[in-house]
Structure formats: C-alpha cells, structure tokens
Amino acid sequence: MFSTLIFLTAVTLLMMPSQTVPAPLKDVNDIRVKGLLPLLRQRQLQIMPSQTIPALKDVNDIRVKGLLSLLRQRKQEIMPSQTIPALKDVNDIRVKGLLSLLRQRKQEECDDPDGLMCCTISEMPTC
C-alpha cells in the first residue's frame, strides 16, 4: 500500500505543470525559457483548439496590446513574487500566462460595438 501511495504521488507530480518562476528572467536565452515556443505549438490543441499560434513580433503587436496591463492586474494569480516588465519576446515564460489572457481578452473585445476586434488570432494582423 505504501508503494502504491508513492507511485500515485510521483504520477501526480509528473502531471502537474510547474507554476513557480525562481528568479526574474534576464533574457530570452535563459535556460528556463528555451524551447517554450515549440512546446506551446505541441500543446496548441489543448490551449486553442481552432487557432494557430503565430509568433508575437513585439510588445506592440495588436495581439499583445492591452494584455500587459491585464497581466499586471492578475500577476498575484500568475506569479505572486514577480514583477512583470515589458514582454520582450514570444519565448518569454510570461507568454504562458498571456495565452490564457489573450483568449479572455479576445472574448471581451468581441463585445466591442464596432466589431473591430472580433477576429481570430491568426487573422488579427490583417483584419
């Protein structure tokens, strides 16, 4: 019975994604963020079933505008011990939180009476 408990604990730990960020990231080549984008692409069916995940060019990209302030408001939920400076690159670990916020933000903006923001994520640069 004890070995079963250890096995179940190990399986649970393997299935739980890590939520901690031990220290502020200095740059996008930090070992903790290398390879994040390919992982996001592998998981895109779980994250956004009908969307592709195009590269975010910079913080001024239409898909990111307004999200940093939303992320700052929710930083206690996402990374309680971290400050959130400007997003530098799509490989930044902060994109993990931005993807879920992007879906939420897109839904909020689709209530816009002008309808200008009611695009799919992949259409945004051209809509």
Curated annotation (Swiss-Prot):
Gene Ontology CC annotations of this record: extracellular region
Coiled coil (UniProt feature): none
Compartment annotation: Secreted
Single GO term (MF): ion channel regulator activity
Modified residues (Pyrrolidone carboxylic acid): Q44, Q76, Q107
Expression tissues: Expressed by the venom duct.
Keywords recorded for this protein, A-Z: Cleavage on pair of basic residues, Disulfide bond, Ion channel impairing toxin, Neurotoxin, Pyrrolidone carboxylic acid, Repeat, Secreted, Signal, Toxin
Post-translational modification note: The turripeptide OL172 conotoxin-like contains 2 disulfide bonds.
Propeptide regions on this chain: 42-43, 73-75, 104-106
Superkingdom as given in the UniProt entry: Eukaryota
Main location: secreted
Signal peptide interval: 1-20
Domain remarks: The cysteine framework of the turripeptide OL172 conotoxin-like is C-CC-C.
Chain's role: Acts as a neurotoxin by inhibiting an ion channel.
Protein name: Turripeptide OL172
